[in-house]
Amino acid sequence: MTMLDTTSTVAVSLYALLSTAYKSMQAVYSLPTDVSLASHGLGGFDELPSVDVIVPSFNEDPRTLSECLASIAGQEYGGRLQVYLVDDGSENREALRLVHEAFARDPRFNILLLPQNVGKRKAQDRCDQRSAGDMVLNVDSDTILASDVIRKLVPKNARVAVGRMGQLTGPQPKRQLADPFDDMEYWLACNEERSQQARFGCVMFCSGSCVMYRLVSASLLDQYDAQYFRKQRFGEIDIHLSHAEGSFRTEYRPSAHAATVVPNKLGPYLGQQLRWARSTFRTTLLGAPLPNLNRFLMLDVVGQNLGPLLLDHSVLTGLAQLALTGTAPWLAALMIVAMTIDRCSVVALRARQLRFLGFSLHTFINIFLLLPLKAYALCTLSNIAWLSSLLCWQLESTSTADARTTECSDMRTASKLSPPPSCQANDV
C-alpha cells in the first residue's frame, strides 16, 4: 500500500465510522416519542389563532409569485388570515405589477414595495413590525403551499414555546432531469435530519420556505437581525439560533407539505449549494460551543462539518494516487460504494419508495461537484459579496387604501447590536 492509498483509506474509514454512528443515532431517535404538547401544561386556545403570512420577494418570476400567493389565498383555515407581501426592490417590478394589483384586491393581502433592496432579513422585519397575528408564517416567494399547511402548522394549544416547520418537496410536476434528485434531497433533509432534531425541540435548520412561529417569539427578530459570525452579519444564518435563545422549541410537521422551485441550470444550482454549505458551516459552528447540547445534536454538529472534509480528503488523495502512480484506490472506492448502497437501501425501506435506490447515482454529483464546493465554502465563510450593500432601514411609509399597496421610503443605518447566545437544547 502506498502512502496516498493508506491516507485515502484511513480518511474514508473515519468517515464511515462517523457516518455509521450518526445514522445509528438517527435510527434510534426517529422512534416515536412519548413527549406530548399537553405535558407542558398550558391550556387551549378559546378560538382559532390569527395567522399573519409574510412573503419576502426579490426579482421573482411573476408566474411563480402568482402561484405562491394563490396557494396562500386558498388555505383551508377558519381563523383570521392576513398576508404581507414585501417586494424587496425588485428590478422586474413592472413585470410583477399585474400580480401585485390582482392580489391587492383581496382584503387579506397587503403589498409593501420597498424602493431599494435591503436584504431578506430587513424585508421580513418590515412586515414583522406591522404583524399583529397570534402566529407568524414565513413563506418564500418561490414556494407553493398545500391547501392544509396552515391548519397543520397552527398548534392546538396556547403553548407559546413552539415554532414549527413543514416538509419541503421538489417541484410538481418534475420539469427537469435533476428534479427527482432535488425532491429526494429535500425528503432526506427533512425526514432524516429535522425530524430527529425536532425530538429535542431544536431543529438546527428551519428553512424559510415554510416555518411558523408564535408572535411572542417573533420579538426575537431583533436578535436574529443582529447575529454575527466572525464579526460580520450574514443574511442566511438561521433564525432558530435567536428563536431558541428565549427557550422556544422548534418542531417539525412532516404532514405540512410545501413545494419549492429548484434551479434548472448548473450555475444557479451550484450557487444555491454554495450558499447552503456556507450557511451550514456557519450555523453549526455557532452551535458547537453550547454547553447543554445533547449527544445527538453534538454529533449532528460534528458530522455536518467534519464528514464532508473527511470524504473530500479521501477523494483528493485517491485522485492524487491515480495521477501519480497509475493505480486506483480500490479499497476506498469500494467502501464509498458500499456505504452509498447501504444508505440508499435503508432509506428506500424506511420511506417505502424504491426511487431512493436510484439516489445512488447522486453520489457522482456529490463527489465531483458538491464536495469541492463545500471545501471552497469552508475556505470562504467570510464572503459576503452576495449580500445587499444596504443593510438597514427605517420604517416610513405612505398608504393607498384603494390598492392596499404601501410604498416604503427613507433609509438609515441601524446601530450595531451584540451577537446573541446560541441555541440550548435539553437532553431527552
Curated annotation (Swiss-Prot):
Q: Which InterPro entries match?
A: Glyco_trans_2-like (IPR001173), Nucleotide-diphossugar_trans (IPR029044)
Q: What is its EC number?
A: 2.4.1.-
* GO annotation, biological process: extracellular matrix assembly; hyaluronan biosynthetic process
Q: Per UniProt, what is the membrane topology?
A: Peripheral membrane protein
Q: Where in the cell is it found?
A: Cell membrane
- Any idea which UniProt keywords this protein has? Cell membrane, Glycosyltransferase, Membrane, Nodulation, Plasmid, Transferase
Q: What does this protein do?
A: Involved in the synthesis of Nod factor, a sulfated N-acyl-beta-1,4-tetrasaccharide of N-acetylglucosamine which initiates a series of events in the host plant species leading eventually to nodulation.
Q: Which PANTHER family does this one have? A: HYALURONAN SYNTHASE (PTHR22913), MANNURONAN SYNTHASE (PTHR22913:SF12)
Q: What is this protein called?
A: N-acetylglucosaminyltransferase
From which lineage does this chain's organism come?
Bacteria, Pseudomonadati, Pseudomonadota, Alphaproteobacteria, Hyphomicrobiales
